[in-house]
Amino acid sequence: MENEFTYEDYQRTAEWLRSHTKHRPQVAVICGSGLGGLTAKLTQPQAFDYNEIPNFPQSTVQGHAGRLVFGFLNGRSCVMMQGRFHMYEGYSLSKVTFPVRVFHLLGVDTLVVTNAAGGLNPKFEVGDIMLIRDHINLPGFCGQNPLRGPNDERFGVRFPAMSDAYDRDMRQKAFNAWKQMGEQRELQEGTYIMSAGPTFETVAESCLLRMLGADAVGMSTVPEVIVARHCGLRVFGFSLITNKVVMDYNNLEKASHQEVLEAGKAAAQKLEQFVSILMESIPPRERAN
């Protein structure tokens, strides 16, 4: 499906937000399933329910509160999505990624994407954090790309490169932040693969995804990253490993959304500290609003 939004639609939403808040964010953070507690770390917070904001879709999944929260985190002006949108909710990719282009028009230059993911890499354990080094856009192989349709040069070029989608310098700074935290558990790094959902993977599918080189699998993130890079935003992402993907027919365990939420809750404090420290390493704003 081609983009149902015009440039003016994005502008109207950005102008509505500008007129309702004095915050001028530099960093946008998309909070994944069960990770919305990051917003509690913001100072001078100001929140809007998605249903207040023109053109914004609505979150329908447990663990996604459906609020846009502005504030400051470690000296950086931020806007956080307390809940994202997914293909499996029935949303087009232009709706899934709508907020990212609005953030760009608000002056955001850095996007931090977080998600809950299943671990495909046998070395990963539940509770691990994996920095996203690269991604595999599985829906993209079937023509589901958020940039499909006429290109708007005001956002970016027709054929954007994705070989450097995740900022290398930010990943290195993330490793430094992890050391600063004194965590005993190793900080992981790997490739995230997106499936459309809402079903979890079969054993055969899981084995195939691992053969493709994926370390973690989830149902989000990639469309937002593609649109962010199209707009020229710096992108940093990480996955919280909330379950180990079943890759053996003799394994009777089953993935569930409840365990995803519980793993997010258990790791909340660690994640909040990690993102907070990481904010210090984001370069100052390069362009004025």
UniProtKB/Swiss-Prot annotation:
Its EC number is 2.4.2.1. The keyword Repeat does not apply. It holds the Pfam family PNP_UDP_1. Disulfide bonds: none annotated. Keywords: Acetylation, Cytoplasm, Glycosyltransferase, Purine salvage, Transferase. It catalyses: inosine + phosphate = alpha-D-ribose 1-phosphate + hypoxanthine; guanosine + phosphate = alpha-D-ribose 1-phosphate + guanine; 2'-deoxyguanosine + phosphate = 2-deoxy-alpha-D-ribose 1-phosphate + guanine; 2'-deoxyinosine + phosphate = 2-deoxy-alpha-D-ribose 1-phosphate + hypoxanthine. It is found in: Cytoplasm. Pathway: Purine metabolism; purine nucleoside salvage. GO terms for biological process: allantoin metabolic process; dAMP catabolic process; deoxyadenosine catabolic process; deoxyinosine catabolic process; immune response; IMP catabolic process; inosine catabolic process; nicotinamide riboside catabolic process. Phosphate binds at residues 33, 64, 84-86, 116, 220. Its main location: cytoplasm. Gene3D superfamilies: Nucleoside phosphorylase domain. NCBIfam families: PNPH (TIGR01700), PNPH-PUNA-XAPA (TIGR01697), PRK08202.1 (NF006054). Catalyzes the phosphorolytic breakdown of the N-glycosidic bond in the beta-(deoxy)ribonucleoside molecules, with the formation of the corresponding free purine bases and pentose-1-phosphate. Preferentially acts on 6-oxopurine nucleosides including inosine and guanosine. This is Purine nucleoside phosphorylase. It comes from Rattus norvegicus (Rat). The gene is Pnp.
